[in-house]
Amino acid sequence: MTGQVRVAVIGASGRMGRALLEACDNHDGIVLGAAIERAGSTLVGVDAGEMAGIGHLGLALVDNLDAVADKFDVLIDFTSPEGTLANLEWCARQGKAIVIGTTGFNHAQKEQVVAFAEETPVVMAPNMSVGVNLMWKLLELAAKVMGDYTDIEIIEGHHRHKKDAPSGTALKMGEVIAQALGRDLEKVAVYGREGITGERDRETIGFATIRAGDLVGEHTAMFADIGERLEITHKASSRMTFANGAMRAAKWLAEQKPGLYDMQQVLGLN
């Protein structure tokens, strides 16, 4: 595809949606083609830029994809698992690419994403920050060097409104570490501890979750030995880091064939 990539943002009035609208406005090679809200929203008809606090864009919010089907090439979706699957099905029918930043999918829902990706290009990533994706590469190296003789813990914190726990990013951290060590995360993950738990099993990977205030996103992996520990941490101070990553993914995805891709591929880290 040549020229600008036309992007649609769904869930435009949410915290992430507003950041995505701002990122669209700031990125060369990206043009905002549509901004979509839930059906019946009182914001329908309002200028998307004025709603997001970035100035008049001359683009009114709508409440269904069919109304703007000819206005965009790539849909960006950070909504909910159920909503995202419905939007993905629509994109597959229409031949539209989709960038998915939604988290909280169960196993069956992930299988549906895989199936739809046979029909249309999909980037799906629990975190689109460049720093987080680099962190996953560092975790793979740390696990290979230290994982067999250290206790591994993952601690994550987000704002009080986040609905799923642990975060998709934390789970991906666990998957990267477990895969590097030849372990099955479903068998070795320990989610929180309470009461008399007994001595720690060296094979386990622990998860701890914080939900407080307006934390944007903080993730730490700890490799703890007797006498020393290594901590690898990423802290996001603004949702714009995720929104900017989504713009990068959208531009890359517009050139791809149908298939399921991740941010490692977008960034050339594979």
From Swiss-Prot:
GO terms for molecular function: 4-hydroxy-tetrahydrodipicolinate reductase; NAD binding; NADP binding; oxidoreductase activity, acting on CH or CH2 groups, NAD or NADP as acceptor. It catalyses: (S)-2,3,4,5-tetrahydrodipicolinate + NAD(+) + H2O = (2S,4S)-4-hydroxy-2,3,4,5-tetrahydrodipicolinate + NADH + H(+); (S)-2,3,4,5-tetrahydrodipicolinate + NADP(+) + H2O = (2S,4S)-4-hydroxy-2,3,4,5-tetrahydrodipicolinate + NADPH + H(+). SUPFAM superfamilies: Glyceraldehyde-3-phosphate dehydrogenase-like, C-terminal domain (SSF55347), NAD(P)-binding Rossmann-fold domains (SSF51735). Pathway: Amino-acid biosynthesis; L-lysine biosynthesis via DAP pathway; (S)-tetrahydrodipicolinate from L-aspartate: step 4/4. This is 4-hydroxy-tetrahydrodipicolinate reductase. Gene3D superfamilies: Dihydrodipicolinate Reductase, domain 2 (3.30.360.10), NAD(P)-binding Rossmann-like Domain (3.40.50.720). NAD(+) binds at residues 11-16, 37, 101-103, 125-128. (S)-2,3,4,5-tetrahydrodipicolinate binds at residues 159, 168-169. NADP(+) binds at residue 38. The active site is at residues 158, 162. Keywords: Amino-acid biosynthesis, Cytoplasm, Diaminopimelate biosynthesis, Lysine biosynthesis, NAD, NADP, Oxidoreductase. Its main location: cytoplasm. The keyword Translocase does not apply. It is found in: Cytoplasm. NCBIfam families: dapB (TIGR00036). It comes from Shewanella amazonensis (strain ATCC BAA-1098 / SB2B).
